[in-house]
Amino acid sequence: MTNIRKTHPLLKIENNAFIDLPAPSNISSWWNFGSLLGICLILQILTGLFLAMHYTADTTTAFSSVTHICRDVNYGWIIRYMHANGASMFFICLFMHVGRGLYYGSYTYMETWNIGVILLFATMATAFMGYVLPWGQMSFWGATVITNLLSAIPYIGTNLVEWIWGGFSVDKATLTRFFAFHFIFPFIIAALAMVHLLFLHETGSNNPTGISSDTDKIPFHPYYTIKDILGALLLVLALMTLVLFSPDLLGDPDNYTPANPLNTPPHIKPEWYFLFAYAILRSIPNKLGGVLALVLSILILVLMPLLHTSKQRSMMFRPISQCLFWILVADLLTLTWIGGQPVEHPYIIIGQLASIMYFLLILVLMPMASTIENNLLKW
């Protein structure tokens, strides 16, 4: 008798995706982040659902409803902090996942890569809207500043901003719609993740060498299921350490002050995972220019397959490109640091140099290094 998992219409989809899937025998721990992102998403949806049961999306009660969750709801504090810090873990995994794709040339799977970029944008939008919901000072002013950036769009900018706000300022209508969108987006992300996997399974996984692994495949289960479980345990360990020992480490103290439209915080800044993009935005004196640079800093990922000039797919055997890749990582860490600093000397110039370096590395230096390495192969 044929095994039910191979014949049942639903089970065979699961089987072909997670059990009998032929996987390269040499994929490293850098390939764990896809499954970790799936776990993060499920965790965020579950904790978010329980938070939504007690949250009220109204300007007068939003802040106190979050306080009520932390003080009066059974284990509300742990659900709230798991959700807030779960977002941080989500972005850590996202950055690692994208970094892995850049290093090992996974972007040559164009469809998978482009869906991934859309997923990144969707996740960033969701996280931004979620940050507004507690209706603290940084929630309110973050929403005001970031939505206001759209006013830089010529001709329709101001109308667009007021349309998003649902009025002439960030108010009750804004909060309500942000809550609605924040609730629905994770399900859209889950659907996109399935499409992401669908495209990936059309080609099969890449591997550290960047060479076809068709000659040496192993079944996903049990080899990579057990490996993913280990990754998941480490993820949960890191998350729970953060939640139980220093839940506010990555948050902003200003968000424990209820939103006040009449009082601007001294330093308006987003959550840590947006700081690199925020630094790029701030380093350009022109408003529209800053907004364009902000969008392009992420959208540049779409160009990666076009900028690939190397004869080799992976960076595994390309020392010059490796060096530039790690300089890019250091540059992004510098931008993250700058994004959290006040706009004053010397931070302004450091931010501008780091922003120039970011685009220069991706658009000019890395393709040049690849060409040099191609020529070195001839010697």
Curated annotation (Swiss-Prot):
Signal peptide (UniProt feature, chain positions): none
GO molecular function, one term: ubiquinol-cytochrome-c reductase activity
Cofactor mode of binding and number, as noted: Binds 2 heme b groups non-covalently.
Family: Belongs to the cytochrome b family.
SUPFAM superfamilies reported for this sequence: a domain/subunit of cytochrome bc1 complex (Ubiquinol-cytochrome c reductase), Transmembrane di-heme cytochromes
Keyword Acetylation: no
UniProt membrane topology term: Multi-pass membrane protein
Domain of life of the organism encoding this protein: Eukaryota
Cofactor: heme b
Record-given protein name: Cytochrome b
Gene3D superfamilies to which the protein is assigned, alphabetical: Cytochrome Bc1 Complex, Chain C (1.20.810.10)
GO biological process, one term: mitochondrial electron transport, ubiquinol to cytochrome c
Its biological purpose: Component of the ubiquinol-cytochrome c reductase complex (complex III or cytochrome b-c1 complex) that is part of the mitochondrial respiratory chain. The b-c1 complex mediates electron transfer from ubiquinol to cytochrome c. Contributes to the generation of a proton gradient across the mitochondrial membrane that is then used for ATP synthesis.
The protein's assembly and partners: The cytochrome bc1 complex contains 11 subunits: 3 respiratory subunits (MT-CYB, CYC1 and UQCRFS1), 2 core proteins (UQCRC1 and UQCRC2) and 6 low-molecular weight proteins (UQCRH/QCR6, UQCRB/QCR7, UQCRQ/QCR8, UQCR10/QCR9, UQCR11/QCR10 and a cleavage product of UQCRFS1). This cytochrome bc1 complex then forms a dimer.
Residues involved in heme b b562 binding: H83, H182
Miscellaneous comment as given in the Swiss-Prot or TrEMBL entry: Heme 1 (or BL or b562) is low-potential and absorbs at about 562 nm, and heme 2 (or BH or b566) is high-potential and absorbs at about 566 nm.
PANTHER family xrefs: CYTOCHROME B (PTHR19271:SF16)
Ranges annotated as spanning the membrane: 33-53, 77-98, 113-133, 178-198, 226-246, 288-308, 320-340, 347-367
Record-listed a ubiquinone binding positions: H201
Positions annotated to bind heme b b566: H97, H196
PROSITE patterns documented for this protein: CYTB_CTER (PS51003), CYTB_NTER (PS51002)
Keyword Kinase included in the entry's annotation: no
Keywords: Electron transport, Heme, Iron, Membrane, Metal-binding, Mitochondrion, Mitochondrion inner membrane, Respiratory chain, Transmembrane, Transmembrane helix, Transport, Ubiquinone
